[in-house]
Amino acid sequence: MGSTAPLRLPVIDLSMKNLKPGTTSWNSVRTQVREALEEYGCFEAVIDAVSPELQKAVCNKGHELLNLPLETKMLNGNKPEYDGFTSIPNLNEGMGVGRITDLEKVERFTNLMWPEGNKDFCETVYSYGKRMAEVDHILKMMVFESFGMEKHFDSFCESTNYLLHFMRYQQPGKDGRSPALSLHKDKSILTIVNQNDVKGLEFETKDGEWILPTADNHIVLLGDCFMAWSNGRLHSPLHRVTLVANQARLSTSSFSFPKDIIETPAELVDEEHPLLFNPFEITELLAYCFTKEGAKAVCDLKQYKAYTGA
């Protein structure tokens, strides 16, 4: 018998021509998005809102940022998860640029890293962040429509912040596969990742199998906050990064987070779907992730509920 073909994530075309609300193509993509987020919690996305030139430019800016002296990068340290400088020596380092759709905030971050200014960095990451936030907005709109929750959409989006995160992984120095980022779930609403042509991201299915998406497309994944909002109808997937020898990697990830409280709408609670999570604040969830209990639980929202009664 032949070998079983490797599992593949759904590939969804998010080209702007398909993203006009009310059209047949919109409705088709909306169905695909809902089904993928229910079954896998993630999918590969063909996105033309960001040109190859802009994607390459923002990747270069990520390297430029992470090439700064350690003492400079530490000026943006001691921040919540994703927003700030993090480093695991000889493995990876990352930096988040918060409030990426607010030009004034991006300028402030840029001036912190480069007191003499760096207009090109500021303009590039702001442009990229805005375009990715637009895609994120469209995806959330599709999800809300699919649940018949349009009346809650505007207030939900008004309570959303966007963040751009660069993560650079050192080239493994040994043969075979090498773990580069441990198993975890994102705490975001949505995350949109670009691997910049180097594979590494892996997702665990509900059945315990592993899927390795291609490095050709963006990858959209659902975070615990959106899972909680949906009352468990959407799936927040476990994932990790594993690299092979002779491959360095830099990823760019666009996150959307609630500004404060995440709460399940009453319309999504019924006898068949009892309330899974009480309202909780994102800052408290992120703080839990850094406790001993949170680290042991791969920062899982269900363990957070048991720990806090949320």
Curated annotation (Swiss-Prot):
Q: Which InterPro entries match?
A: DIOX_N, IPNS-like_FE2OG_OXY, IPNS-like_sf, Iron_ascorbate_oxido_reductase, Oxoglu/Fe-dep_dioxygenase_dom
Q: Provide the residue positions that the database annotates as binding Fe cation.
A: 184, 186, 239
What is this protein called in UniProt? Deoxypodophyllotoxin synthase
| EC number assigned by the record | 1.14.20.8
- Co-factor: note: Binds 1 Fe(2+) ion per subunit.
Origin organism is Sinopodophyllum hexandrum
Q: What pathway, per the record?
A: Aromatic compound metabolism; phenylpropanoid biosynthesis
Question: Which cofactors does the annotated protein need, by name?
Answer: Fe(2+)
Lineage, please? Eukaryota, Viridiplantae, Streptophyta, Embryophyta, Tracheophyta
Q: Highest taxon of the source?
A: Eukaryota
Induction is noted as:
Transiently induced after wounding.
Q: What does this protein do?
A: 2-oxoglutarate-dependent dioxygenase involved in the biosynthesis of etoposide, a chemotherapeutic compound of the topoisomerase inhibitor family. Catalyzes the conversion of yatein to deoxypodophyllotoxin. Can also use, to some extent, demethylyatein as substrate.
* Molecular function as annotated in GO: 2-oxoglutarate-dependent dioxygenase activity; metal ion binding
Write the record's keywords in alphabetical order, separated by commas.
Answer: Dioxygenase, Iron, Metal-binding, Oxidoreductase
Q: Which Pfam families match?
A: 2OG-FeII_Oxy (PF03171), DIOX_N (PF14226)
**Gene name for this UniProt entry:** 2-ODD
